[in-house]
Amino acid sequence: MASFANPFAGNVPRKITKEELIQAIRLDIAGELEAIFVYDAHVQATDDPVAKTVLADIRDEEKAHVGELMTLLQYLDPDEAERFAEGQQEVKEMLEKLNISTKGTTKPNTTVGSLVKE
């Protein structure tokens, strides 16, 4: 949550390690996903067309942030990137077993952020 009362809340006594940065990026991703959920709930809860439009736009920007952070995480932790790719492949194989075509639905190595309409 916001800590505006403390002007030094963002100051840190040292640079973080790569491992700490990876953990921080994961936490950032969780925060972005939570923001997407909240903004989407607001969109669904109002009939005001201006509010719906603005909130949906903000929600979609958060989706792009997830994509940016996922890309950064994959850069910082190539092993984790391989596991993400393995998971994507497993789902593709399941879809094939169910005779569901994925051709033309997504680009290879897509992320949540890359699925946002441009």
Predicted segments, located by residue:
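Iron-associated oxidoreductase/ferritin-like identity signal
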Residues: 1-118
